[in-house]
Design a protein with these regions (language model features):
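Conserved acidic carboxylate
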Residues: 17
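Short amphipathic alpha-helix used as the core "switch/output" element in two-component signaling
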Residues: 50, 72-83
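The feature encodes the CheY-like receiver
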Residues: 22, 67, 95
Length: 139
């Protein structure tokens, strides 16, 4: 990887979300909060694998339920291939079992979509090393 490519990778965030409206909402939030970042988005696990291989994003926002993959299992696969990549698993489902599975798979944290407007930007800032980690826990 060249220095230019490496810099671009460190600035890239990938959204993996099958619902088009949610994907666009996430993109809008991230572009407003982090205008210097490159925001990519895909709708399924296969596209996520390919995009990670090609672009090596610094951060992946991973939907738990994808049409062709379980987002937590996909997180584990991506973390094996790209250990330095940060992953935030997102779901409409809350519950300690989901949080524990996501963390065990290598996710940095687990975001319940009901808390998106309050928790997304701080979680992303911490994952990207822009803000210091605090004891936010998981939402």
């Amino acid at each position: 990887m060249t220095n230019e490519t490496d810099n671009r990778c460190r600035k890239t965030v990938l959204i993996v979300e099958d619902q088009a409206l949610m994907r666009q909402t996430l993109r809008d939030f991230l572009q407003d909060a982090f205008p210097e970042r490159i925001i990519l988005d895909v709708a399924d696990g296969a596209s996520a694998r390919e995009t990670c291989k090609t672009h090596r994003p610094a951060l992946v926002l991973m939907d738990k339920c994808l049409p062709d993959a379980d987002g937590i299992e996909l997180t584990a696969q991506l973390k094996q291939l790209y250990p330095g990549m940060q992953v935030i698993v997102m779901s409409c489902r809350s519950g300690e079992i989901y949080v524990q599975r996501a963390l065990a798979a290598g996710a940095r944290t687990y975001l319940v979509k009901d808390n998106l407007t309050t928790d997304l930007i701080p979680m992303v800032a911490v994952a990207l090393g822009i803000a210091p980690a605090t004891d936010m826990g998981t939402s």
